[in-house]
């Protein structure tokens, strides 16, 4: 109460506080603090993932998506740093979120991760790169955490393949995950594509 002869006192305004008895004035919440209620004796530190850059604030401001801030009581947007490659964040993040299996991100400050391309995989969280399927393996879908072995009677002879190829006429194999097929032996023949056996003459 800042006037004499009064019959009551005034509540501190939102964004302000009074922390002593008999006060004639209210004080604004300082940088890095805020409150949104009247009649308060203190202010609240900005939460992790947020900041308050004005005095007398009734709100805290979330860090932008793609950034994070692990500290309480921050008073500037510069306290929000870019999330590292291999991670992402939404608004108001206190920590980066790692890219999940099947996804990756090779740039910092991002709001999401990319699916692994077909013919590729990502088998760890927080990855900054995707890996092509190796010889004898393939996949034809995005966002995968692994590749599939080629079926018996088929092969994959290139890295990053989205398809498997059937063994041609005169060739065969009876194992999965192969990068080539075997010519039929003398005295045998193979007259179908994708064969897992050879036939004696």
Q: PLM features: residue spans?
A:
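Disulfide-rich, cysteine-dense extracellular ectodomains and adjacent flexible linkers of secreted
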Residues: 1-201
